[in-house]
């Protein structure tokens, strides 16, 4: 849910400059930035979240063809950016290479983890995959390698072409990106024209290196492609809540299906409202870090669960068996924990707050009603 809010704000950050440069329509700051991002309310982010919610409630589904076209648009935009930015790289723009040291690199890694959210969805197809022992690692690792190469090329092109040194506070410490402190520092230090203060970094880079018209194509690509990301995130989340309600972990009203559109409209509208509210008031940096906290905790739990099941259920049928689990598992635990600790204080506090509320809700409401309670679960036939 929070990840969908972050992408909604990201869409807004490209949409506002796009219509400003293309049609000379300027949305004031207080209507294009959330309260905690230096404005009042992010209307474009609310609009796109509301639109996607409506489409989901009406039963609109992405076809494989449409999704493939949108993926091609995203890839084409990144390839175009790299083709224009990489040739004008200046090595001086990488000096100093790590101005905030290893802690700065770690903090950036914790934030950029948001770019890798969703790769785990490939694993859900293990039972439907031919020879999963061979093909699942190829799919997961292959997609990770390809996307990481793109991330490196894009980041290298952006930083190398125009430079991107961090914005520091009065004490010389780096400021968490995307929040009101960053906005204030950018204004006070007159750095709104720099890459680190830009809301649309790739389009900003192309304008700075002499491609203003092409920069609009990048904004247009984001305008067209990002809503599909929001849709898929919200689709998955609503189905998770629907399944939890069906298992009686959440109120039964969330299992209602619309008689005409045959969609779980109640849970969709509630989820969409939460996405809209978060997108309306919070900056993309805080939302992404908050989403990372929950995702890292989920990955940590999965790694721990796999190791426990490997010990307690040795004979369990496994369409895909994690290789070298006693090496991969501990490395995953350490990596997730390290990245979580490097997240912003705000993200960690929000995570612990929501986790506490979830545990209380489960103890008071869900535990007694759940059909997953041991007394309701029928043992599997060993045959």
Predicted regions and their residues:
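Hydrophobic transmembrane alpha-helices that form the core helical bundles
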Residues: 1-49, 53-57, 222-243, 277-297
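Alpha-helical transmembrane segments of multipass membrane proteins
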Residues: 53-54, 82, 155-156, 223, ...
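Membrane-interface loop-to-helix entry segments
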Residues: 12, 40-88, 99-102, 140-144, ...
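Membrane-interface alpha-helices at helix entry/exit sites of multi-pass transporters
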Residues: 132-143, 249-269
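Transmembrane helix-loop junctions in multi-pass membrane proteins
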Residues: 55-61, 90, 214, 250, ...
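Helix-loop-helix junctions that connect adjacent transmembrane segments
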Residues: 23-45, 68-220
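C-terminal membrane-solvent junction of multi-pass transporters and transport-like membrane proteins
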Residues: 37-41, 52, 99, 253-265, ...
């Amino acid at each position: 849910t929070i990840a969908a809010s972050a992408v909604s704000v990201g869409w807004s950050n490209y949409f506002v400059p796009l219509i400003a440069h293309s049609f000379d329509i300027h949305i004031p700051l207080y209507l294009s930035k959330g309260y905690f991002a230096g404005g009042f309310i992010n209307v474009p982010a609310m609009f796109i979240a509301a639109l996607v919610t409506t489409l989901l409630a009406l039963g609109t589904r992405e076809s494989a063809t449409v999704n493939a076209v949108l993926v091609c648009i995203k890839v084409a935009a990144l390839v175009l950016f790299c083709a224009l930015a990489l040739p004008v790289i200046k090595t001086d723009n990488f000096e100093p290479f790590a101005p905030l040291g290893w802690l700065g690199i770690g903090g950036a890694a914790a934030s950029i983890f948001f770019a890798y959210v969703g790769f785990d969805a490939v694993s859900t197809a293990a039972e439907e995959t031919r020879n999963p022992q061979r093909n699942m690692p190829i799919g997961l690792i292959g997609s990770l390698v390809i996307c990481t190469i793109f991330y490196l090329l894009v980041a290298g092109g952006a930083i190398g072409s125009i430079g991107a040194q961090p914005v520091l506070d009065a004490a010389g410490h780096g400021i968490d990106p995307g929040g009101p402190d960053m906005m204030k520092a950018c204004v006070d230090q007159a750095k709104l024209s720099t890459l680190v203060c830009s809301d649309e970094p790739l389009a900003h880079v192309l304008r700075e290196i002499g491609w203003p018209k092409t920069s609009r194509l990048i904004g247009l690509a984001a305008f067209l492609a990002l809503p599909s990301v929001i849709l898929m995130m919200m689709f998955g989340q609503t189905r998770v809540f629907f399944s939890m309600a069906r298992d009686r972990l959440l109120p039964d009203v969330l299992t209602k299906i619309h008689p005409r559109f045959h969609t779980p409209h109640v849970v969709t509208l509630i989820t969409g409202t939460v996405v809209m509210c978060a997108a309306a008031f919070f900056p993309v940096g805080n939302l992404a870090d908050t989403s990372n906290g929950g995702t890292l905790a989920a990955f940590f739990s999965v790694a721990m669960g796999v190791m426990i099941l490997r010990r307690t259920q040795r004979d369990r049928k496994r369409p895909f068996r994690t290789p070298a689990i006693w090496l991969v598992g501990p490395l995953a635990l350490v990596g997730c924990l390290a990245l979580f600790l490097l997240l912003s204080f705000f993200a960690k506090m929000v995570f612990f707050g929501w986790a506490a509320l979830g545990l209380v809700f489960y103890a008071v409401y869900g535990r007694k009603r759940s059909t997953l309670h041991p007394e309701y679960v029928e043992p599997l036939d060993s045959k």
